[in-house]
A protein has these predicted regions:
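Buried, small/hydrophobic-residue-enriched core segments of structured protein domains
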Residues: 2-42, 51-53, 88-89, 94-106, ...
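A short, hydrophobic C-terminal helix/tail in secreted or cell-surface proteins
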Residues: 272-275
């Protein structure tokens, strides 16, 4: 048999295919088992965790929505096959992946369900290749979403009788754009009233509503704190959300908020009609 010449792969920073979010050893294992005739063998994998984060009493199972979308759209592109050839995968395996679509079964707790250690969050039943190659993406998606959703229920008090209105503001500290979007979704699932992330609402809809306050720099731009409050309230009278801690909450922020409330009451309260 003639040796197949493999053209060196050219990196592309703009390329993105979630199916390639795979730890490399998944490919080496799948290729080996494929060549030994096990490609049609059905495997069953359960995903569970051994202890709750921070030794708390429960966790929230989340990430099922994104995982389902991933499996429904699972495929490999020509660029993926090209790269796999350069990494030593067999020609037979690469040709198999070229037309491969995920065709297994996924059983999972409903997203947002309370769950506990050693309880299966997700069960996968699939042919050997599909079961092995999705492990990395499955764990990444479920672990991250569940972590954020669980933390959000505690921050918002959703796990108590006195929940609080909390806005998610984590994108600027997230580990990348995808984490910012997924974190916003999971935080709202865990009880947050909205997110500062505009793209999250564009992706997920009004259930993940984009909301916000103002920055300290906005307050400092004006001659006085009250001037800043008034300018914002005049612009957005139906949605006033402000910061009180730019200077001093008790000595400045709160008194100026009360002053603003008096101003808005006079401005927008209609006089009683005369008899």
């Amino acid at each position: 048999m003639d040796e197949i010449k493999v053209v060196p792969y050219i990196p592309d920073e703009d390329y993105d295919n979630p199916a390639m979010v795979v730890d490399f050893y998944e490919f080496t294992m799948a290729n080996c088992l494929f060549l030994h005739g096990f490609k049609d063998t059905t495997l069953v994998f359960d995903m569970f965790f051994r202890k709750n984060p921070d030794n708390q009493g429960y966790s929230i199972s989340a990430g099922q929505r994104k995982l389902t979308r991933f499996l429904l759209n699972y495929h490999f592109n020509a660029q993926d096959i090209w790269w796999l050839r350069t990494k030593g995968m067999s020609e037979e395996f690469c040709e198999y992946l070229r037309t491969y679509r995920w065709k297994g079964d996924m059983y999972a707790l409903p997203e947002g369900t309370v769950c506990y250690p050693h309880v299966q969050m997700v069960r996968i039943e699939c042919d050997l290749v599909g079961a092995i190659l999705i492990e990395t993406y499955l764990l990444q998606t479920m672990n991250f979403h569940s972590l954020i959703a669980t933390k959000a229920t505690r921050v918002t008090g959703l796990n108590t009788h006195t929940p609080r209105s909390v806005m998610e503001f984590g994108t600027r500290r997230a580990q990348g754009e995808s984490a910012g979007n997924d974190g916003a979704y999971a935080a709202v699932l865990g009880g947050c009233v909205g997110t500062a992330n505009c793209l999250a609402e564009m992706k997920f809809g009004s259930d993940v509503k984009a909301v916000g306050t103002v920055a300290h720099s906005f307050i400092e731009f004006f001659p006085t704190e009250f001037d800043a409050f008034k300018a914002f309230a005049d612009t957005y009278p139906d949605s006033v959300s402000l910061l009180l801690d730019t200077y001093n909450i008790m000595e400045s922020g709160l008194p100026n908020l009360i002053k603003l409330d008096d101003y808005l009451c006079l401005l927008y309260t209609s006089p009683s009609p005369r008899d």
